[in-house]
Amino acid sequence: MIGLGAGALLGGIFLIGRVRTRPSKAALMISGIAWFVLYVIPTVKYPPSFEAMFNPEAAITYQTLLVGYTVISGISALSTIAAFSKVKKKGKMLAAAAIYLTAIAAAYFVFPDYTIENDSLLPQQTLAAWRSAVSLSMTAFWLSLGTAGGLLWSYGTKS
């Protein structure tokens, strides 16, 4: 399900954005930004919880907070890009990034922390390794999505 949504997001941004660079470079840039906005930023606030995988009550709380924060991150990024798309100045990307990060910083303090009493079912080293594996798999997903999208768009422009 995430693959379909991410692919649609990547394709929609590529079509609407009127990208002027090589398709492979554009696809990797778009997927890199999407990875940062939709995975890295929410994970900083709510790192993967092993407890939420096996406890339905903890999962509901964790998923609600994570999805809410991800939606705020995505909407903030889209609205910032939309607002700055009409600006012709050179520093518009830096200004857009600053406004996005300010909005996310505000959301970081508004959203509650995810804390449960028994979040350490695993030893800390094992939990850190598991979180690293989850992060590596999500990074590989977004990288492969950008690579595949770039190859498909390159192939589509040649025919």
What are these regions (language model features)?
Residues 1-6:
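Individual transmembrane alpha-helix segments
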Residues 11:
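Metallocofactor- and cofactor-centric catalytic cores in central/energy metabolism, strongly enriched
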Residues 19-53, 105-121:
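Hydrophobic alpha-helical transmembrane segments of integral membrane proteins
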Residues 21-32, 85-102:
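Internal alpha-helical transmembrane segments of multi-pass membrane proteins
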Residues 36-92:
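Membrane-proximal helix-loop-helix units in multi-pass membrane proteins
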Residues 70-79, 97-109:
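Hydrophobic core of alpha-helical transmembrane segments in multi-pass integral membrane proteins
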Residues 116-135:
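Short, membrane-exposed interhelical loops at transmembrane-helix boundaries
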Residues 148-159:
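Membrane-interface capping segments at transmembrane-helix boundaries
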